Amino acid sequence: MTYLLFLKMAEERATRPLNPERLVPDEFSSHQLLGLSGEVLEDTYNHILRGLASQPGVLGAVYRGAQNKISNPSHLKTLIVDYIDKENWSAADADVNGDAYEELLERSAGDTKSTADQYFTPRALIQAMVEVVQPTIDDRVVDPACGTGGFLLAAHAHVSRDAAGFTPPQREHLRTRFVTGVDIGATTSRLASMNLLLHGLGSISGDALIDQRDALIADPGDRWSVVLANPPFGRSSSTDIGGSADDGAAIYRQDFLVTTSNKQLNFLQHIIAILDINGRAGVVLPDNVLFEGGAGETLRRKLLTAFDFHTLLRLPTGIFYKPGVKANVLFFDKRPAAEQPWTRRLWVYDLRTNKHFTLKKNPLRREDLDDFVASYLPGKARDKRAESERWKSFTYDKLIARDKVNLDITWLRDESPEEADNLPAPEVIAREIVEDLTAALVEFEAVAAALEARAAEPEPDAPDE
């Protein structure tokens, strides 16, 4: 369905009165399907899919491997005539348009999410994160686990509000170089490319803005001034069926501070590596990043000393697809090397205690984050911040003195019992325990191997007297 919707919206871009842009060659456009039925419709649609797959550049990448999975021609005609073609998608309100298309994207990636444990980020949270990080036209924004591109589109929309005053080079930068996405999944990468093209980012003939690869495997060499991300939770680095690296395997990189199989810690290390000096990051990470010992403690010390780790947003449960997920948003800035710690004070906002959300009946809305955004004081000096019931600050000395630098900080009393609806199923809990134990065993084996190798080294000869 996303292929058909892309064709229809591409046709609308080609025929709009102002600044028409043809993304798809006319011979493969959606109007070629109108008025057809039966086998002729099916054959024509298959011809269009094959033709688009053979195109160079981003368009070919989007349609490569595309297949018509609607086996009944009458169903295909109904979908085209009664749903896709009767709507003028580009004339709809931009937010409604984006919601509709991204809902289709998420439906298309539904199997991927449930199978590979990928977490699509609530739009309200994306918007709030972008508002406080405040990307500008001078930035380059990257999401190393971009999914269908939600963070990238939100950052682009935020900066585009001032587009009327941009110079031609700035407009070109905004369209072709402002955002970059990386995702390991073939499906999600393709959907992200389609999403960006339909929102006016990139070009059919230009370089792809979405790179399909495992972001954790190697340092890309490039650096970005803004990182916005919600890396997939779980132990492997996969976010798509069939696209996994070795599940549970430790990642060895020279630019990493520690070697671990914990995917969230590795994504944090990767983001630390690709963030430019004075760059800003907003990253969604699970609770274990705040309290896990060993590699986790080492990275927390690094964040507090070599970075300005200034804000922590404790997220409520019930906002992700998997019940019971407990996560946070870490906001930090990369600073030049210095003798003194860069973090002076960590501000923590508790949006979790006594807050109850569900995906359908009580979803997280943008207004639920109004107080956090107001407390953050985007663009203003952080010494102007003022504490409140849910908003407290902690000095570097107090943080570094905590046992194992545990940053799992709470102070509000939880007055409600744990809701059964927010608890994972027993088999899910059991599987997560197995994954944690397996990952811990891998790390212990690596430590043991290193110790054995060190013990096997010959002792240096004693100096002559």
Model-based region annotation:
Residues 6-10, 89, 105-109, 157-160, ...:
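Non-catalytic alpha-helical coupling and interface elements of nucleotide-dependent molecular machines
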